[in-house]
Amino acid sequence: MKLVINGEERNFSASMTVEALLGELGVDSRKVAVERNLEIVPKSSYAQVAVNDGDKLEIVAFIGGGSDQADSFTVAGKTFNSRLLVGTGKYKDFEETALAIEASGAEIVTVAVRRVNLSDPSKPMLVDYVSPKKYTFLPNTAGCYTADDSVRTLRLAREAGGWNLVKLEVLGDQTTLYPNMPETLKAAEALIKDGFEVMVYCSDDPIQAKMLEDMGCVAIMPLGSLIGSGLGILNPTTIRIIKDTVKVPVLVDAGVGTASDAALAMELGCDGVLMNTAIAHAKDPIRMARAMKLAIEAGRLSYLAGRMPKKSYADPSSPTSGLI
């Protein structure tokens, strides 16, 4: 079912009542007013009035004067307030994973697909600590080196959790974990034909990035440097060119080591940053998660504000007139 809500098209699995829709959107029905196809829906009727395919809805609330300056970003028709995406691996335990994700403010978390431990099926799983009802799970193909393995993995992920929004990564070798672009292109084509919405890990090559966008990928995720290296963004110029070349969201994926790396990615104009090791392997992962949250926000504000032009000469801050 397709709905247009506040001017944006959104997809839902089935028809539902206004009350159920607000619940799925995480909106408190007591604090909003709803208009459906230009007709106001009385609050007393939220549980009875159905929304159907093609309906147009406006959901409004009171604000404290002026416009809402929330700086969200949208991928595959879904809107998120946090531009920080985090991985769930490499932590000492699931409890630390959950605490770090909470501190980061992230709404999207990547999850790898692995076989169930049949020798101990009662062993705790990630979903026991990090709920897919609270966060958007982004299944990925970490550890896959061929297009066929990647496609197979994501089909299993969709069967397990019903997720169509996925992160594709096809690795070239175990030493660099650099993206294998021919296999990535092959896998992306197959997944898109199969109805997946593909966010794709790729090289920092603007030509390849444009090819992936033209195929139908919903987000381009060039590496800043090698996965887990912490080397930061080695080629900021190519990242900027990719951002200028494609229209879909661009998120730096891999290589971030500290908060300044995350801020730089955002200052380049990127729509977001995905990281895992930088938080999980910090001496204090919870504190680093908070640092990354603030770095993303600071870098984004800096980009929106616009930096001063660089000069090759001095320009005094104080006025020169009236000197004694």
UniProtKB/Swiss-Prot annotation:
<dbReference type="GO" id="GO:0005737">
    <property type="term" value="C:cytoplasm"/>
</dbReference>
<dbReference type="InterPro" id="IPR013785">
    <property type="entry name" value="Aldolase_TIM"/>
</dbReference>
<protein>
    <recommendedName>
        <fullName>Thiazole synthase</fullName>
        <ecNumber>2.8.1.10</ecNumber>
    </recommendedName>
</protein>
<dbReference type="Pfam" id="PF02597">
    <property type="entry name" value="ThiS"/>
</dbReference>
<comment type="function">
    <text>Catalyzes the rearrangement of 1-deoxy-D-xylulose 5-phosphate (DXP) to produce the thiazole phosphate moiety of thiamine. Sulfur is provided by the thiocarboxylate moiety of the carrier protein ThiS. In vitro, sulfur can be provided by H(2)S.</text>
</comment>
<dbReference type="InterPro" id="IPR012675">
    <property type="entry name" value="Beta-grasp_dom_sf"/>
</dbReference>
<feature type="binding site">
    <location>
        <begin position="254"/>
        <end position="255"/>
    </location>
    <ligand>
        <name>1-deoxy-D-xylulose 5-phosphate</name>
    </ligand>
</feature>
<comment type="subunit">
    <text>Homotetramer. Forms heterodimers with either ThiH or ThiS.</text>
</comment>
<dbReference type="GO" id="GO:0009229">
    <property type="term" value="P:thiamine diphosphate biosynthetic process"/>
</dbReference>
<feature type="active site" description="Schiff-base intermediate with DXP">
    <location>
        <position position="167"/>
    </location>
</feature>
<dbReference type="Pfam" id="PF05690">
    <property type="entry name" value="ThiG"/>
</dbReference>
<dbReference type="InterPro" id="IPR033983">
    <property type="entry name" value="Thiazole_synthase_ThiG"/>
</dbReference>
<keyword id="KW-0704">Schiff base</keyword>
<keyword id="KW-0963">Cytoplasm</keyword>
<feature type="binding site">
    <location>
        <begin position="276"/>
        <end position="277"/>
    </location>
    <ligand>
        <name>1-deoxy-D-xylulose 5-phosphate</name>
    </ligand>
</feature>
<dbReference type="InterPro" id="IPR010035">
    <property type="entry name" value="Thi_S"/>
</dbReference>
<dbReference type="InterPro" id="IPR003749">
    <property type="entry name" value="ThiS/MoaD-like"/>
</dbReference>
<comment type="pathway">
    <text>Cofactor biosynthesis; thiamine diphosphate biosynthesis.</text>
</comment>
<keyword id="KW-0808">Transferase</keyword>
<keyword id="KW-0784">Thiamine biosynthesis</keyword>
<comment type="similarity">
    <text>Belongs to the ThiG family.</text>
</comment>
<dbReference type="InterPro" id="IPR016155">
    <property type="entry name" value="Mopterin_synth/thiamin_S_b"/>
</dbReference>
<dbReference type="GO" id="GO:1990107">
    <property type="term" value="F:thiazole synthase activity"/>
</dbReference>
<dbReference type="InterPro" id="IPR008867">
    <property type="entry name" value="ThiG"/>
</dbReference>
<feature type="binding site">
    <location>
        <position position="228"/>
    </location>
    <ligand>
        <name>1-deoxy-D-xylulose 5-phosphate</name>
    </ligand>
</feature>
